[in-house]
């Protein structure tokens, strides 16, 4: 079922078969908040959902933050009895292309999963479908899914301040619905296939275009550094791809995913982007997709 913020069915009646003879609710040992979150928006949504699930299911919560590259160098495996709220941002309508291989390498081990994608108020396109398919192939059992519109990583105005109190309240209610569904399951294997919006197989990445319809390529774009930089090394330490030279922040020595983590974390506000195509695309996004406000979508 698909629900939006305005759906009157706030709590689903999913427990009617819970006490049927021969069936007992499955045991959840640990709720996990697992996420890649360059600018902390996905982190906020996933943590809110996981914390509430932990409270409702009365089991411990652990965090698996794989934003930084050194974390992704170690294989990760979950197990039966885990309930993993698994969040990624949406880049170009998909799970980030520089991240999807790592996500595919994570072993579900029979754990339940709640795929969550956070996007910048344009569109999540096939991202949730892609994450669901990837987690399923990795041995997870997706039990529910959600999309949340958050502040765009490029912008200070597009989706500014989101997730806000309204979003996080919806996240809490969603967790309650997930809890009811989990409590009605006799086992993870009994979880029915999760239906979400998006194509299967997934479609191409979203391509930004100028007003004449010509494609804009921002893949080679890298951040610049102002003279106010003190070489504190914060940006190099925080870069999810370790693309910034720790000895000289002016040097970008690897691929950049335009996540803007370095821009947001620099204490001197010395990191910035000045590429004309990047700025054009940023302006187009702000002009076309700041409004109307898009609300969370919940899939159960």
Please report, for each region that a protein language model flagged, where it lies by residue.
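Iron-sulfur cluster-binding cysteine motifs and their immediate structural context
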Residues: 224-225, 230-257, 261-279
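Short, charged low-complexity linear segments at domain edges
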Residues: 200-221, 230-246
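FMN-binding flavodoxin-like domain, especially the glycine-rich phosphate-binding loop
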Residues: 14-68, 74-218, 274-300
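Aromatic (phenylalanine/tyrosine) cluster motif
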Residues: 3-5, 19
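Acidic, Ala/Val/Gly-enriched low-complexity intrinsically disordered segments
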Residues: 7-10
